[in-house]
Amino acid sequence: MYPQGRHPAPHQPGQPGFKFTVAESCDRIKDEFQFLQAQYHSLKVEYDKLANEKTEMQRHYVMYYEMSYGLNIEMHKQTEIAKRLNTILAQIMPFLSQEHQQQVAQAVERAKQVTMTELNAIIGQQQLQAQHLSHATHGPPVQLPPHPSGLQPPGIPPVTGSSSGLLALGALGSQAHLTVKDEKNHHELDHRERESSANNSVSPSESLRASEKHRGSADYSMEAKKRKAEEKDSLSRYDSDGDKSDDLVVDVSNEDPATPRVSPAHSPPENGLDKARSLKKDAPTSPASVASSSSTPSSKTKDLGHNDKSSTPGLKSNTPTPRNDAPTPGTSTTPGLRSMPGKPPGMDPIGIMASALRTPISITSSYAAPFAMMSHHEMNGSLTSPGAYAGLHNIPPQMSAAAAAAAAAYGRSPMVSFGAVGFDPHPPMRATGLPSSLASIPGGKPAYSFHVSADGQMQPVPFPHDALAGPGIPRHARQINTLSHGEVVCAVTISNPTRHVYTGGKGCVKIWDISQPGSKSPISQLDCLNRDNYIRSCKLLPDGRTLIVGGEASTLTIWDLASPTPRIKAELTSSAPACYALAISPDAKVCFSCCSDGNIAVWDLHNQTLVRQFQGHTDGASCIDISHDGTKLWTGGLDNTVRSWDLREGRQLQQHDFTSQIFSLGYCPTGEWLAVGMESSNVEVLHHTKPDKYQLHLHESCVLSLKFAYCGKWFVSTGKDNLLNAWRTPYGASIFQSKESSSVLSCDISADDKYIVTGSGDKKATVYEVIY
């Protein structure tokens, strides 16, 4: 009955064999269970040991690959230097006298004849020096195991004979140190040059740049400066005059003060490539690799500044210091209120591991477990039309082993294949360290909506059967009109009843009558602020007779729309150099403005006076919304916080800390839920009292604007990735998605939830009809 090797049953003398009492049978079963439990424990210990060894092997593999790749690059570099020096010598030698020419020629020939003995001696000396340096700075060097089975990693040429000494990793400590230093210099160079490019402007975001200075200043190597100059030269080859206005709102990595408004030609980012970040690194090699860079907003705000000599604010760099110190996905400093860690710094468009390998080794431990990289062209198992998202950014199967290993160790997306340009820097599981079991739901389809519990546990959301159906839930949206504003459209709003659309651009607001199909020209133009200053926000009072406009100036303009021709009724002047967002109280008596200095100004519209300032944000306040009953205000800032304010008592109620800058937010008209758009490309839906939340991952870049439908059942978000996404409240089932030709900077929904208007970086606004 029992196999051999099991514990024998206790046998009492005086009784026939195999006749047990119930108690003896229970004892036997207990012994068997304890035996199995001991076996299970030993197997589990063995499994954990093997898992740790596997993780360590993956880290070693990537480190080995990094060394090999670095040496390969260095070899090609030195070869090219030698060729150029030879050319120079050949050009100079004819100027020498005949005898000197012969002497120099002989010396050159002798220099070329390096014997293996000399080479080995040189290598040994270099290794000794490197080991001394490693011991002095980082302790004993890390020794890597040989590649398993003696095989070379894919893409690495085999190393032979004495040259194998080049791959000795005794200097790994110093190599890692140099890697960190190079990365730091590269980021700081970006920050320094961006700041210098904005110094010529009357910058309303001096305080914004000030927050950048804490990231440290160091001496920049000549090599880093040279790389930056080469990047600019390469970008200038693809300049397009038609795109010059785009970078006024969207940062296109053109930091040359002499040419502040030139941006490369753009096309839709079919591969989901994060252009802004790739441009911040090494210069691209083709126009395709800088596609859509002109529709790339800076990471400082939802485009709170521009590289323009006009009075436009300067921004934080689009390559922020990576915040990889988050212990778990979604960690925040407030218990129970967690957010995704920031995206890793820029990724090169070349299909090799250069960018990923530039990351310091020390940050890999959090992301040791490999996880599934998958597309999210379908929702969490319930999308009715998968074709709607087809081609968003699928990862082809020919992913190389080295790239996959690097992705596992670094928590980054693997490159598609060596030499390929396109890859997705923001898959659903980007850099979160989530186990692969969370990458999909039981149906096997990729997940993009996750529920985050109070303790930070993330689980894919199983959508209810009525997620995409039911009263008040749209089926899709149809584009019905394009309003050619002529400048980048940073602000839009729709009148109630739905007839007029207001688009804010550079120095003016244009009014469009959308009740007449095919209308191609505005019915009125409201010139406000200065001619070169951008409108950031425009809000209608509930009666539709008054429009309030704010932007890159210290004044808010109040327009009387009821007069025969619109006229300026009043101007409100604040101490802040810019206003980034506006909100109106439901009773239309008070206006709230988000200031570039972080304060929230409260204005009495009847007396046209400043009555209060909410102080708390340590950096610019970028977005704002007010509760339906007018008792609570929500604000988001570039200090990575979302704050709520009690308007009756005039005090701060809550603060939610994140690891990413906040670019947009919206409060559900029916209460309870607050949706927040991040620089990290996530949308997070928070409950106003409970600590758990939802995290949505369909955007591939910064989420620049967000608006709830008036019914509260759905909301839309727009981003630097050219996408307009519609989500179900609160769990984020994707209702529909529309892709535009440039960054979508602003959006609004009509009061009857039948129309959506978006403003984009290609100087137009788009009107959508919502189909139910």
Curated annotation (Swiss-Prot):
It is found in: Nucleus. It holds the Pfam family TLE_N. Residues 200-268 are annotated as: CcN domain. Its main location: nucleus. Residues 197-207, 284-299 have a biased composition (Low complexity). A motif (Nuclear localization signal) lies at residues 225-228. Placenta and lung. Residues 310-322 have a biased composition (Polar residues). One of its GO terms (molecular function) is transcription corepressor activity. WD repeats lie at residues 484-522, 530-569, 574-613, 616-655, 657-696, 698-737, 739-771. The modification N6-acetyllysine is found at K232, K275. It comes from the Eukaryota. Signal peptide: none annotated. Residues 1-131 are annotated as: Q domain. Ubiquitinated by XIAP/BIRC4. This ubiquitination does not affect its stability, nuclear localization, or capacity to tetramerize but inhibits its interaction with TCF7L2/TCF4. Ubiquitinated at Lys-720 by UBR5 in response to Wnt signaling, leading to substrate recognition by the segregase p97/VCP and degradation by the proteasome. Residues 185-196, 209-247, 272-283, 300-309 have a biased composition (Basic and acidic residues). The modification Phosphothreonine is found at T259, T312, T319, T321, T328, T334. One of its GO terms (biological process) is negative regulation of canonical Wnt signaling pathway. The modification Phosphoserine is found at S203, S207, S211, S217, S240, S245, S263, S267, S286, S317, S413. Residues 269-452 are annotated as: SP domain. Belongs to the WD repeat Groucho/TLE family. WD repeat Groucho/TLE family members are characterized by 5 regions, a glutamine-rich Q domain, a glycine/proline-rich GP domain, a central CcN domain, containing a nuclear localization signal, and a serine/proline-rich SP domain. The most highly conserved are the N-terminal Q domain and the C-terminal WD-repeat domain. This is Transducin-like enhancer protein 3.
